Structures are given as C-alpha cells and as structure tokens.
C-alpha cells in the first residue's frame, strides 16, 4: 500500500483521526458525522427566548422551557438519550474539560478537572430540576418527544432530518451550533472507518477501500445521507446541495473520542459514574476522581 498516504491525504484529517491509535493508522475514514443543536421553533417563540449560543444560555433555556404545557403534560428543555461519551463529550469539551491528556495515557487531572466536573454538575443539576430527561426507562423516545413538543432541544446528527420528515412532516424546527463554553463550540465526531485485517487478497481489498473513499463512491453515499470524508467530493454540487452545511461547519471543531483499546470499558465506566451523580449518590467531584483512577489503570494495561 505504497499510496496509502496519498489516499489518506485526500480525506478529512478530523475523520482520519478516528482510525488512528498511538500514532499508527489502522484504516481509512469512510464517512463522518457530528451532532448539532435542534430546537423547537414554536416553543422558543412562545417563551420569548433566543436560541442559546453559550452553555450558560443553554442551561437557562432548559429551565425556562421546562414545565407543563397547555394540555397539562410535562415538557422538558432538553432530551438526552444516554450518558456515554457520545452524549456527554460535547458538553465536557465545550466547557473546557477533557477526558485524557493529549497522549491519551492519563485521565487524572483531566477527567476530574474543574472544567469536566463543572460540565457534569451542570447536567446533573438540570436533571434534578426536571429540565432535562431522556435516558431513563420509560422516557418518551427522542423523535416522538421532539416532534410532539415535549422536548424543546436535542443534540443530534444528520439522520434526524429524515426521521423527523417521515414521522412529523409539519413539525417546525431549526438547527444551530453546539452552545459554546470556555472551550468553544465543540461537538463529538462520529462516522465509520474501513479497515483491512487478515485478507488473503490484500491488493483487491485495498482497491476496494480506495474505491469506497473515492469521489464517485463518496458522492453516491451522500445521496443516502452520509457526509463524505473525501475532500473533493465535499466540493461537488451534489454534496453542496444536500443539507449538510450545518454539520460540516460543526465538524471544523468536532473531536473524536479517545482512540484507545480500552475505550469500550472506559465509556461504560463514564456512563456509570455520571449516573451516580445525576441520581444524587455522589458529587460530581467524587465520581470523577474515582473514575479518573479507574481509567488510569485501564490506560496502563
């Protein structure tokens, strides 16, 4: 694969970072995505508040938009279906926090930093004030809750456009960047990679990988709602005509979750720790201190 660097160089660097561990590449980025803010136009208009541009404004909007609607139903300012890294990273990073050091070898001092703890505290406090919900069994599914006016805001990806159009075609919503904090407006990087393992036909496998990341294949995938990672494909009329602009803008600052072998366990431990905080079993500092110690051990394995 003497042309690996040439092929990889034609793909978005941010997306390629998801296929890298310890400075070594293990594949090519295939597509990419990220999450942006979706908000209910009518709910914001009726409340007389502006779309939040900062995390402080976001927290304030969550409180003002929660309560009881005209039908006597409970409504919430924000819906979040989980407490994993995919869900929490935009808040942690935007508020200036982090999960590990740059080398991804240490969590203590990062995962339990004052900035990370502040992000978790904000989340927990909003939950305790009944301003956000979504991850508990029995909660209204995200698309239904948003489309029926029970949730005022979401952080979601491009797939939500088709879901809402199919289920609630008359529902009016708009999108905006992730509210910014001390760290800026930073969302989480998603998408898929394509890799070769123990193929008996390495040349054919590499040819297929190159085809899937070519301009032609990437434009075809864009027609199905996938955001291309091929830089040339991003400049085509087909891709520019798609409703990707808000996501592509957010991708300029989006970050990937730690590319470490222990990420699955790391992520599970993160969700468990934050659950303890939102349930009031531990303070954010206590939970993050304990979590940082656990993750240090995982990273050292």
Give each language-model segment a name.
Residues 62, 105-135:
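Glycine-centered hinge/linker elements that transmit conformational signals in sensory
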Residues 55-59, 134-148:
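Short helix-initiation/N-cap motifs at beta->coil->alpha
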Residues 21-30, 35, 59-108, 151:
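Extracytoplasmic/periplasmic solute-binding protein
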Residues 1-11, 68-71, 76-78, 97-118, ...:
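Short, solvent-exposed loop/beta-turn-alpha elements that line the ligand-binding surface or hinge
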Residues 23-24, 46-47, 121, 128-129, ...:
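Extracytoplasmic/periplasmic substrate-recognition and gating elements
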Residues 14, 18, 169, 222-272, ...:
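Long, aromatic- and glycine/proline-rich binding clefts that accommodate carbohydrate-like moieties
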Residues 1-35, 91, 170, 174, ...:
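Hinge/lid segment of periplasmic solute-binding proteins
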Residues 1-11, 42-53, 152-153, 163, ...:
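Extracytoplasmic "Venus flytrap"/periplasmic binding protein-like
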């Amino acid at each position: 694969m003497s042309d690996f660097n040439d092929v990889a160089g034609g793909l978005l660097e941010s997306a390629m970072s998801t296929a890298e561990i310890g400075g070594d590449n293990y594949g090519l980025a295939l597509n990419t995505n990220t999450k942006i803010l979706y908000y209910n136009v009518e709910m914001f208009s009726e409340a007389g508040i502006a779309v939040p541009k900062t995390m402080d404004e976001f927290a304030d909007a969550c409180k003002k938009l929660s309560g009881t609607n005209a039908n006597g139903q409970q409504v919430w300012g924000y819906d979040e279906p989980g407490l994993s890294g995919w869900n929490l990273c935009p808040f942690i990073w935007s508020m200036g926090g982090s999960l590990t050091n740059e080398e991804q070898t240490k969590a203590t001092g990062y995962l339990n930093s004052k900035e990370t703890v502040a992000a978790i505290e904000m989340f927990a406090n909003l939950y305790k004030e009944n301003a956000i919900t979504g991850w508990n069994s029995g909660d209204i599914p995200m698309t239904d809750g948003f489309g029926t006016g029970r949730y005022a805001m979401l952080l979601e990806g491009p797939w939500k456009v088709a879901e809402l159009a199919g289920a609630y075609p008359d529902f009016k919503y708009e999108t905006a960047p992730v509210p910014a904090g001390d760290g800026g407006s930073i969302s989480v990087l998603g998408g898929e990679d394509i890799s070769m393992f123990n193929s008996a036909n390495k040349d054919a496998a590499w040819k297929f990988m190159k085809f899937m990341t070519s301009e032609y294949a990437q434009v075809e995938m864009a027609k199905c709602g996938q955001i291309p990672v091929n830089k040339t494909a991003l400049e085509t009329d087909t891709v520019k005509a798609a409703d990707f602009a808000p996501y592509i803008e957010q991708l300029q600052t989006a970050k990937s979750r730690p590319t470490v072998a222990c990420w699955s366990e790391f992520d599970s431990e993160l969700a468990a720790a934050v659950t303890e905080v939102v349930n009031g079993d531990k303070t954010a500092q206590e939970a993050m201190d304990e979590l940082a110690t656990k993750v240090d051990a995982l990273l050292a394995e």
